[in-house]
Amino acid sequence: MELQIKIQNFQGPFDLLLHLIKKNQLDIYNINISEITGQYMEYIESLKEMDLEVTSEFIVIASTLLQIKSRELLPKIQDEEEEEISEENPEKILLDKLIEYKKFKNVASYLKGRLEKGFTVFSKKPEIIEKKEEEDKDIFIDVTILELYNLYNELITKYKDKINLSNTIPEEIELEEFKIGDKMNYLKSRIIENKNLSFSQISKECSCKGEVIVTFLALLELIRIKIVKVVQEGNFKEIYLERMEENEADELYY
């Protein structure tokens, strides 16, 4: 396993070069690499006390930077210019490697973000879906084209009637109020009357979702104060409500 050592928050020389390019607001695709040579060498000076094996990669890049800068400062004669054209440009090679490193670093950052986001996502476990045999039935038996047309028009008319083009409320909406205390008293009386009372039975008697929610909260409160207990044989099975006896309440601890 390869050991990656961070030196003052930089993972290798290319990471340092990218930092200097960003710090000096330079374009990586159009840069004179010698512009950041001085700053790079200042950083190398601060690594004198570090292990040579750790700083060797930094020193290799530093020598390349000095080579590039020295070639720019020294005068060129015609023979050297022709030789330079035929040889590979060290500055171009370094920039190509730096651009490639930047691409991999961006991809690594993206994958890290996806990994961290994945810890907050929970997927549903796969189920075994039984294949149902398709019944070969002709649903259009004794149905005429005219009857289909009339049915289509009826559906379109109902759909248009539901659309509120004026963006106004045609009638006042009355707020249905349900109190938890009232539902608690109602549940206690129902449990006394019916010893085998299920929550689904209570829910069916509710007129809306809001009443179901208030009824459920009332049930939780009755359980908390040890007046009612619920019995369920297994997950997703029916929930039955029973009155709690005094001796049972003394044995429970919350």
UniProtKB/Swiss-Prot annotation:
It is found in: Cytoplasm. GO terms for biological process: cell division; chromosome segregation; DNA replication. Keywords: Cell cycle, Cell division, Chromosome partition, Cytoplasm. One of its GO terms (cellular component) is cytoplasm. The keyword Glycoprotein does not apply. Belongs to the ScpA family. Participates in chromosomal partition during cell division. May act via the formation of a condensin-like complex containing Smc and ScpB that pull DNA away from mid-cell into both cell halves. HAMAP family: ScpA. Component of a cohesin-like complex composed of ScpA, ScpB and the Smc homodimer, in which ScpA and ScpB bind to the head domain of Smc. The presence of the three proteins is required for the association of the complex with DNA. This is Segregation and condensation protein A. It comes from Clostridium tetani (strain Massachusetts / E88).
